[in-house]
């Protein structure tokens, strides 16, 4: 009897362990992440950067990322900017993170103090976030940055 109970307990334990070994949750689709961000942050006055901007400013060519979208202000009175990159794998995502970090540093280093001084805190407080193979950055107001982050993180819930 003891042996039967031990075998049943061992089988139950093995079954529990196997069911807990499910694969990682699938990452959200790029379009779903951009839609979530667009619903949280007013991007209506922003324009999408083209491949030449991405290459010139980030040093990234098509093929260095699976998908990307960089939105730049279309208004000359603010510096709002929001970017989302998706790498094909973890190593590509790490390279994207480095490229975005370098880009944000370039923006800081090239800032002219007399140009829109009230906007400079947005650049100083710019943030970069990563989740899985995604890299996102935001040069936005405090509220805009928080809304973008909340929308981004909500996609990975």
Model-derived regions: residue spans:
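Post-signal peptide N-terminal segment of mature Sec-exported envelope proteins
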Residues: 28-47
């Amino acid at each position: 009897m003891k042996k039967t109970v031990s075998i049943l307990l061992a089988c139950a334990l093995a079954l529990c362990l196997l069911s807990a070994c499910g694969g990682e949750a699938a990452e959200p689709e790029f379009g779903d992440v951009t839609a979530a961000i667009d619903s949280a942050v007013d991007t209506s006055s922003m324009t999408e950067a083209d491949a030449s901007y991405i290459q010139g400013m980030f040093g990234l060519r098509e093929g260095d990322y699976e998908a990307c979208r960089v939105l730049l202000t279309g208004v000359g009175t603010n510096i709002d900017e929001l970017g989302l990159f998706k790498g094909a794998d973890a190593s590509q995502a790490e390279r994207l993170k480095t490229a975005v970090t370098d880009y944000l540093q370039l923006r800081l280093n090239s800032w002219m103090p007399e140009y829109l001084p009230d906007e400079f805190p947005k650049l100083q407080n710019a943030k970069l976030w990563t989740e899985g193979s995604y890299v996102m950055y935001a040069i936005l107001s405090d509220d805009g940055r928080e809304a973008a982050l909340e929308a981004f993180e909500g996609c990975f819930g």
